[in-house]
Amino acid sequence: MKIRASVRKICDKCRLIRRRRRIMIVCSNPKHKQRQG
């Protein structure tokens, strides 16, 4: 999980979701997991 100030989709399978007021990116590729910090 990468904590970033700005999150963006890296590939086509990345999905942007909101969880507990945080914007997160989930993907089938674990390297693409991101959270806005």
UniProtKB/Swiss-Prot annotation:
It holds the Pfam family Ribosomal_L36. It is found in: Plastid, Chloroplast. One of its GO terms (molecular function) is structural constituent of ribosome. The keyword Metal-binding does not apply. GO terms for biological process: translation. PROSITE patterns: RIBOSOMAL_L36. Transmembrane segments: none annotated. It comes from the Eukaryota. Its main location: plastid. The keyword Transmembrane does not apply. GO terms for cellular component: chloroplast; ribonucleoprotein complex; ribosome. Keywords: Chloroplast, Plastid, Ribonucleoprotein, Ribosomal protein. Belongs to the bacterial ribosomal protein bL36 family. HAMAP family: Ribosomal_bL36. This is Large ribosomal subunit protein bL36c. The gene is rpl36.
